[in-house]
Amino acid sequence: VLLYHRVADTGYDPQQLCVSPENFEKQLKYLKRHYHFINVEEFNHHLNTNKAFPKNALLINFDDGYADNLLNALPILEAKNLQSVFYIATANLNTNHLFWWDELDEIFRNKEAINNQVLIRLLKTYGLSNPEQLYAFLLTALKTAGSLSVRNDLLEKIRQLGTINSDLSPYRCLTYHELKQLAASRSAVI
């Protein structure tokens, strides 16, 4: 199983969750030459019958439910007659809410809006020397937060660092209408 999150040109991607549409197309071209793409039905058949998968079997999936999955990835998958599984995080459907990792990225991307006093205090508190180290530290802390309440408390502190750009379209998740469009495609399994 090959996992993707996003197919988009965001210009800022410190976690490397995105692949550009051009690179996605090139990757699929390469993968088609060297791997045996299987669809969900084949995957389930091999899994449920304990039959060996074909050599170099490959199933693509997407996590999270970003709008670019429909707008950028799906047309490429359809053109290549490939199928992918899409796992949708439903909490952000039809909203302008950001995933916590996107919120962290956006705060650090918008460097001119960072509150330097808060930045200096956090750097000193955690014994770090630059914003990049702080970003990595906070990302790890958020990923390993033991509970949702611990993560939300940490996010509240992080929000004191800076503001989020008003254009959230690069991080937008699917709308209900777009989810139905995605589900209608033979190249998508949700």
Predicted regions and their residues:
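Catalytic alpha-helical scaffold of carbohydrate-active enzymes acting on polysaccharides/glycoconjugates
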Residues: 1-190
